[in-house]
Structure formats: C-alpha cells, structure tokens
Amino acid sequence: MQSCARAWGLRLGRGVGGGRRLAGGSGPCWAPRSRDSSSGGGDSAAAGASRLLERLLPRHDDFARRHIGPGDKDQREMLQTLGLASIDELIEKTVPANIRLKRPLKMEDPVCENEILATLHAISSKNQIWRSYIGMGYYNCSVPQTILRNLLENSGWITQYTPYQPEVSQGRLESLLNYQTMVCDITGLDMANASLLDEGTAAAEALQLCYRHNKRRKFLVDPRCHPQTIAVVQTRAKYTGVLTELKLPCEMDFSGKDVSGVLFQYPDTEGKVEDFTELVERAHQSGSLACCATDLLALCILRPPGEFGVDIALGSSQRFGVPLGYGGPHAAFFAVRESLVRMMPGRMVGVTRDATGKEVYRLALQTREQHIRRDKATSNICTAQALLANMAAMFAIYHGSHGLEHIARRVHNATLILSEGLKRAGHQLQHDLFFDTLKIQCGCSVKEVLGRAAQRQINFRLFEDGTLGISLDETVNEKDLDDLLWIFGCESSAELVAESMGEECRGIPGSVFKRTSPFLTHQVFNSYHSETNIVRYMKKLENKDISLVHSMIPLGSCTMKLNSSSELAPITWKEFANIHPFVPLDQAQGYQQLFRELEKDLCELTGYDQVCFQPNSGAQGEYAGLATIRAYLNQKGEGHRTVCLIPKSAHGTNPASAHMAGMKIQPVEVDKYGNIDAVHLKAMVDKHKENLAAIMITYPSTNGVFEENISDVCDLIHQHGGQVYLDGANMNAQVGICRPGDFGSDVSHLNLHKTFCIPHGGGGPGMGPIGVKKHLAPFLPNHPVISLKRNEDACPVGTVSAAPWGSSSILPISWAYIKMMGGKGLKQATETAILNANYMAKRLETHYRILFRGARGYVGHEFILDTRPFKKSANIEAVDVAKRLQDYGFHAPTMSWPVAGTLMVEPTESEDKAELDRFCDAMISIRQEIADIEEGRIDPRVNPLKMSPHSLTCVTSSHWDRPYSREVAAFPLPFVKPENKFWPTIARIDDIYGDQHLVCTCPPMEVYESPFSEQKRASS
C-alpha cells in the first residue's frame, strides 16, 4: 500500500506517526488524519497529500450516515415544510442562545464500524480470563447458544419497550410470567415480580417493604450476607430513616417489637447451610418480617425458604444462563407471600382477559408504581432487567426441573469431592454442610496456596480473617478439580477422591435440608427441551411483539433509537462476558480503559467533571445523585436541608427517588406554556430557603420545550444554598448543542439506554451513570469489595448497586456509539432528532393541538398531542387512539403523561422521513375517523377506535357484525398491507378485571396456543 501511495505522489503514515489510532488500538492504522489536528511542525506538502488522499479514498462507511435516518434530501424537504433555510436556523429558534455551546466538541474523529470492532478486540484482550471461584453471588455458567443467538442477539427481543401496550406485547409478557412462575416455584412463595436490578438492590427494596408494612425503624441483618448486599442495604437505610444492625441470629433481639424485618443469606456468603426456622418464628412472633437472600440453583436441591415461613425471598438469577459480565446486567428476583403483593416493588405480570374473554397477559397493579403514585409508590423502579429475566426463564424452560436439579447436583457433588480432597490434604473446612462454597482454613501458608493458584490462573476469595473461599459452578470439570486439589497440595486426583468416597448419599441430599417438594411442574417447563422446540417457542413469542424491527416506537421521553449491530456485537465476547466483578484490577485492564475513555467522553458531552457508572438505571441514578447531594450537604453541616423542589410535570421517578433519598418533596407549578412557573418557583424557594436541598428538573422539559430561563432557575437555587439535579432523560436533545454542566446543573444521570444506544430490552437492562461537578465528586458512591475512591479525602455516599461499575458488560455499546459518531455526528444526531419532531408537529398541527411550544414556536425533540377535546366531541380518549394505532402497525406514543389525556411523541434521529410520514398519515387518518364520529357518519359506540385493536383472529372470523368493513379495521391506509402488517395478537385488554382477579403465575395450559408436550410424546 505504501508503494501505491508513492505512485500517487503521496506519503501514507503508519501508526501514531502518520495515521490515527484509537487509544488502546494495535497494529497499523490507515485512517486519515483529522483535518483539525496539528501536524506538529510537519511540512505543508504532507498536509496537502493527506487532504488529496481523503478525496481519492473517501470514506464509504460513515456510521453517522447509517445511524441518522433522514438523508440530505429528506432534511431539505422537512426544513422546507417548516419554512426554514437550514438546520442551524431551526436550532437557533429552538435552543436558547445563552446556553448553546459556542465551540465544537473536543472528541476524536469518528471511527468506522470495522475499525471500532478491531479496537474493541484490542481493548478486550487486556482483560485476563482466569477461572474465578470467588462466588459472592456471581458464578460462571454455561449460556445455551440457542438462547444467546435467538434471544440476546436478536433485535426482535432486545429493541422492544416495557410492555405497557399488552396487545402488542404478549410474547415477552408470557416470558416474564414464566420467569415469575419459575421464581415462585423454586422459592416456595406465592407471588414474584418481573425482576429487579440486582441482588443488593432487591435486599434494599425488602428493607423498604418491611418498613412500609409495619412502620418500624430497625432492620436486622445477618453479617454473613454478601458484603455488597449489606452495603447497599445500609446506604438505603441511612436515607430511609431506618437503623440497620448487624447481628448473628443468636444475637437478634425482637423483644422490643421495634424490628421491621430481618435479612439473612441461605446458603450464606461463607457457604454454610443452616436452619433458620427458629429465627423466622421469633421474627413472626414479634410482628417482624423475615427476608431471605438465596440462590435459585441451590434451591433446586435445597429446602425452599417458603417452606420454613419466609415472607420475602430475593437474589440473583444470573447463574441461570446469564454471563458474569464484570458485574452485570443480571436480573434479580423478588418473591413474597400473597398478603404482601400490593406492597411489592417493580413490575409484575398478571393474567387477565381481553374483550373477547380470552385469557391474556398484562402488567398488573400499576397503580402502586412510580409513574402513577410518584413519591407514594412502592419503589422508584422504572427500568428493571426484563431481557435478562427472559434469558433466565428460557434457561429454566430449556432444562426443566430435572435438568436444573441435575446441574445443581453436579455442582454440589463437585464441591463434595473438593471438600474431601482438601481435608485429606490437611486443610480445615469451616462448615460441614454447604451447597457450592467452601471456607477453608489452610493447613499451610495462604501465600503459598495463592501463588500456586496464580500459576494456574485461578482466583479465590480471600476473607479478612485469612481464610480462603472457593465457590464452584456448572462449568467445573474434572480438570478444574484436579487443578484445585494440586493448588492445595492434595496428592490424589479428583477421580481417586471420588472413588474413595463411593456413591453413598452425602451432603444436602442426605440431610434434613433436602428438597422434597416438586417445582416447575407447569407444562411450559416440560415441553421445550429440544433445541428445535425451544427455538420455535422463542420465535413464536417474538412474533407477538412489536419492536424496532417492525416500525418506529414514538414513545415520548423514551428515545427509542437505533441499537446498531456493531455496538451490540462485543457484549457477547468472552473477554467482556466472562470476567467476575471482584477480580483484581490488573485482570480487568480492558474494562478499566473503557471506563476511563467513556467517562472522559461523557464529561465532554455534559460539562461535568466526573462520572460514576454504578447506577443500573435512570431511576437508580436519580437516587444516587440525590444521595450524593445529601452527603455533600451533611459534610458542610447542612444536614437540615432536605426539601426538594420538583415541577409537577416531572417524571414519576423524580419524586419517588427524592423520597428514597430522605427528601421532602415540594411541587412546583407549571405555567400554561409548559414551563416552570417562575413566580411560584420564587415563592417556594423563599418559603423553604433555610431547608432547601435541591431542585429536580428535566431539560428540555417533560413538556417538550427548551425553557428560556433555565440558567436563571439554576442561579436562583444556588443563591439559596441548594443544588440542581438535572434529569438526563432528555439528553438526546442536548448532546453537542448545550451542556447541563455549563448552564448551572450540579449533577445528572445519563440514560445510556436512551441517548447512548443501549437497547431497552423490553424493560431493561439500562444504565444510569451520574455525572457531577467537582464539588460533588468526593461524595460519589463507593464499593466495599473494590474501592472506587480516587483520593483519601473522599467521603462516599455509600453503595447503590451490587457491582462496583454496575452493568459493565453493556457499557461497550455506548462507548462504541460515541466513538463511531464522533463529535460532529453526535451533534448531527441531536439536530436531526429536533428536526424530526418539529416536522411531525408541523404535519399534525392542523389536525391535533400541539400542547406546548418554545418561545419562538418550536418544540424540542418531542411534543404533546392534545386528545382531550375528543372526549367531549366523540367520546374518544387517548387510549382509543393508542389502541387504534396498533392497527396501523405502530406502538402508541407515551399515553396520558405528563398531561392526562394526551399523547407524547418522540421520533428520535434514527427514523427517516418516510417512516415519519407513515406515522403522521396514520394519526391524520385516525383524526378523520374521530371526525366521522363527531359528524354522525359512524356509530359512537361501535367504531374502529372503540373496537380497536383488530386481531387476525377477529378479522378472519366467520362472524362480522360491525358497521365498518374488515378492510377499514385491518388495512386502513395503503401502506398497511397483508404482506407486511404487524398484527395485534389479542383484542383490547380488560385492565380492571386483571387487578380484581390477580393471577401472577402461569395459567393452565388450555390458554396457550398449540401446546406441545415432550412428556405426552414420551408416554405415547
């Protein structure tokens, strides 16, 4: 290639000297220099040659062009519709001049997709994959390739949204119901939710449930719980006003009747299996609740906690087919007795019926959640871990109860063999009964043992008392056992030890702790054990759900943009997937480099000084950010400042998170233009100035406008001693145009699953890292196992997630998105998102009222359609429009939020003009259908809106008595064609029936379509 370049009279550089390479890249890099980069004193001929080379070899793989939907022609046409000459003019008329960024972003040049994957390979190679037997809630597992390929790597599964619209979400609702049934069966409890963020968070939610249940302010924790779980619980308790005490069961005193609940681990963090029946009975006698952190795989052979009276069982489902991922994402489970179900946190899938009487699925008891009850909600949970819960459910379905029991027995047998070999080698075991974890008092030098382990690249857990911990898993084979025995100086092989032990019943199967109750007896767990059948089952469920593979999902405040294949590819690489979160840092240098680079880029994009990646969702980021503010104020001696001002238009998570952080919420009015009411804000600040802690604002506002006085709002709060928390949910309208850290915000969470391309996964995973200004940096969260303190003066707020860096394995997605877009591409994405929204608003403004606009008549990246007048004119509500949109092949916009009776639309930058036009055409057609009702041309009760959605079963039925045609029902516009139509699979849901007849586990098999039973096949 050099000779070819010389033939053109050019000079082509290699490596750092003449080309551009991303940090961490290796090998020659042929990308041209940035035009803005300095030559460092090089000659002008070389610079000219470089520019000539760019013209001769132009880029043909510009990722921004792939990511941003509208091309140049589309953009010109949309600008013409708006009566604007350029996109710069649009931004000038939309974003206040005083906050606009006056310089280009200081970012590396964009990188092509092939190069980004090569660079990520180089970074990931710096992670060392040792065999980690550290345990503590994280285990190696065998991820079935059929689930990996057909679910985790499948855009039809990962690009769905939380199933608020059940008629187009029956597939993942069924899968999540399977997950809940799995959890209930294995734990022996009555009801389970559809996942929480991680085990530590689940334990903290248990603490809050106990407090809500009996209003007692003391919570007892067994110190043999996992240390990260204890830390998360203690941090939550600090701001909830609950006192936590670490006590062994024999030390726990319930006589004062002041204990809300007790938390213990079964088996505990040291591996011990013990009987907690007496503890549970003592707790119940005093009116306290018993909470058990446990292990689903262990419970496949171990007596379940529901059988000895536990009220709440929680833990991680990670070892059910989900990789370690350096800490996540993993789905936590949470199960309760039936009497506690209405206080349970998080989403819950229930069985109900549709308009035809068919049993179907929906999200149940939503009135207890943050988007409705706000600060009085059971939790602030919004995003959870739906995708990982679906993986765990499919793992259980694929293996069935017998397969899971087989895996559990295999793990337990391996641990028994290892324990026998260790005892023969002169080592002492701390506990006699265990499942998969041993705590070992070495009979020789611990340093010597660790040295031999390092030779084999094996990690153990080192306890503070000098003992070692080993936790085995389903991947352990005979060679692994031989290596472990050699490390501890055992002269026998695993085979010899096993032969000497014989096949007599040992361990849990020979004890009173043996599980005798059946589990996973429902036919769904006994029908899909071949790969053929599990693939067909996953595909059947996928086909019931609308996702980004079908059409745009215009949910306001949700930013359902493209999740590109190149961004997603690295998350399944073993170098990212198979790293335990507590390995020494020198084994995770690739991850550490990625964290540093992503933090640097996010700081540049936001104007903040430091970023913490620990929060696993936007709501958890809110809680972490507000807790950081409280820690800062406490350190200043201003702990009395607890008032948090929140506009009434705020996300429901805002007041719920402020309540979790121990703040007192004071609402602020919104004026008729959708802005914070400046007069009311000033009055509230004056009223609470002595106790003002913070204001929570969203920008652009949740009403879809850039408020002109945002800097004045921030200044007002600062002048009265408060801090500014800016909700990052709408960051997709700011990147490259303005930075919250520049116009007065002190802290924000960043929804990486919105602005920065992590897929929503049908309700999680997400990431909510928080960015802070430097005065808050010393108070960012820490971790008890891996310290995150950057200096000795730090005063961390505590721990908010179980893993030090949260859901680490999905961070490469956002890293890759930023690197491939570059500063210019990121700014273009923001501009296009704003252009798309304004174009749609313009097309729809003569048919629907656009509720709020900015000072110069434009919306931000989203807008609100007012459907309230139709209630009076045609008895049509927002829900009718939402359901009718399904017949046109679209998921509904955000419904009845932030204003009841309205629809909020956010198109994102990824949708091209043709798709925007299809959606607008659908909305205009629906408006005409409403007009037909208003003008008496169609029945006001039996019409396409009230009867929507129209399923395939309905349209093809031999019975059709509706006063409109099947064609109007199913194919209302020319672009809705039989060959490409997405069909709702059920009729309209009956929400009231579902909450009045609560069923949250799998219904009888009669309601399933085309059931297949391997058991029936075998018996025949």
From Swiss-Prot:
Changing residue 329 to T: In one non-ketotic hyperglycinemia patient. Stimulated by lipoic acid. Inhibited in presence of methylamine. Pfam families: Beta_elim_lyase, GcvP2_C, GDC-P. Changing residue 905 to G: In NKH; decreased GCS P-protein glycine exchange activity; no effect on abundance. Changing residue 373 to W: In NKH; decreased glycine catabolic process; decreased abundance. Changing residue 564 to I: In NKH; common mutation in Finland. It catalyses: N(6)-[(R)-lipoyl]-L-lysyl-[glycine-cleavage complex H protein] + glycine + H(+) = N(6)-[(R)-S(8)-aminomethyldihydrolipoyl]-L-lysyl-[glycine-cleavage complex H protein] + CO2. It is found in: Mitochondrion. Its EC number is 1.4.4.2. Changing residue 173 to P: In NKH; loss of glycine catabolic process; decreased abundance. Keywords: Acetylation, Disease variant, Mitochondrion, Oxidoreductase, Pyridoxal phosphate, Transit peptide. The modification N6-acetyllysine is found at residues 447, 514, 648, 664. GO terms for biological process: cellular response to leukemia inhibitory factor; glycine catabolic process; glycine decarboxylation via glycine cleavage system; response to lipoic acid; response to methylamine. It is an enzyme of class 1 (oxidoreductase). One of its GO terms (molecular function) is glycine binding. Changing residue 461 to W: In NKH; decreased glycine catabolic process; changed localization to the mitochondria; also expressed diffusely throughout the cytosol; decreased abundance. Changing residue 548 to P: In NKH; decreased GCS P-protein glycine exchange activity; no effect on abundance. Its cofactor is pyridoxal 5'-phosphate. Belongs to the GcvP family. It is linked to Non-ketotic hyperglycinemia: Autosomal recessive disease characterized by accumulation of a large amount of glycine in body fluid and by severe neurological symptoms. Homodimer. Interacts with GCSH. The glycine cleavage system is composed of four proteins: P (GLDC), T (GCST), L (DLD) and H (GCSH). This is Glycine dehydrogenase (decarboxylating), mitochondrial. It comes from Homo sapiens (Human). The gene is GLDC.
